[in-house]
Amino acid sequence: MSLLAQLDQKIAANGGLIVSCQPVPDSPLDKPEIVAAMALAAEQAGAVAIRIEGVANLQATRAVVSVPIIGIVKRDLEDSPVRITAYIEDVDALAQAGADIIAIDGTDRPRPVPVETLLARIHHHGLLAMTDCSTPEDGLACQKLGAEIIGTTLSGYTTPETPEEPDLALVKTLSDAGCRVIAEGRYNTPAQAADAMRHGAWAVTVGSAITRLEHICQWYNTAMKKAVL
């Protein structure tokens, strides 16, 4: 059975939650063994897949979980706004570390390596390709190039202002066009994740609301301070 077919079964049985285990950089939680522990806890709680950044984190996680891992490498480049899996060597390193799916930036922005070249390299390793997109045009272009999974990950992050709510319209547009969509980006409540599924998402990735304690504490502190002012 193909990995996509296996995921279809898991999603039908468990609901389609993917947990992104990416601690705040330099957080006390930003250690491979802690990332792996969070991933294992998420798997035991019913997550159908895990999203992991960084080769060391992926290696540690691969050793303890059996669910599929979506692997990425983030870089801050001087000559490109693209941050997610920008180079061939990133793809190779993630493949060697045990990723099942490799996600890349799928936006139409200046980049060191073309999207189609990165997709071809992912497929060279026999892995599934996911593209993190920001617009319908991004997603449809990546689908035509052969990406099996389209993520709404970068919606709101390629423009000057980032909205507070997730982009359900993008999920629906891409789903209606025949894309296998992972909704991602600002899904901070179970209700929002459920809305994404109702709008046609294949699965939903949740990160900050589950694995970034600093963000969750800030949300509570902000709300509670407003209540007593």
From Swiss-Prot:
Induction: Negatively regulated by the transcriptional repressor NanR. Induced by N-acetylneuraminate, via inactivation of NanR. It comes from the Bacteria. Gene3D superfamilies: Aldolase class I (3.20.20.70). GO terms for cellular component: cytosol. SUPFAM superfamilies: Ribulose-phoshate binding barrel. Signal peptide: none annotated. Keywords: Carbohydrate metabolism, Isomerase. InterPro entries: Aldolase_TIM (IPR013785), NanE (IPR007260), RibuloseP-bd_barrel (IPR011060). Pathway: Amino-sugar metabolism; N-acetylneuraminate degradation; D-fructose 6-phosphate from N-acetylneuraminate: step 3/5. It catalyses: an N-acyl-D-glucosamine 6-phosphate = an N-acyl-D-mannosamine 6-phosphate. CDD domains: NanE. Its EC number is 5.1.3.9. GO terms for biological process: carbohydrate metabolic process; N-acetylmannosamine catabolic process; N-acetylneuraminate catabolic process. The keyword Protease does not apply. Coiled coil: none annotated. Pfam families: NanE. GO terms for molecular function: N-acylglucosamine-6-phosphate 2-epimerase activity. Belongs to the NanE family. PANTHER family: N-ACETYLMANNOSAMINE-6-PHOSPHATE 2-EPIMERASE-RELATED. HAMAP family: ManNAc6P_epimer. Converts N-acetylmannosamine-6-phosphate (ManNAc-6-P) to N-acetylglucosamine-6-phosphate (GlcNAc-6-P). This is Putative N-acetylmannosamine-6-phosphate 2-epimerase. It comes from Escherichia coli (strain K12).
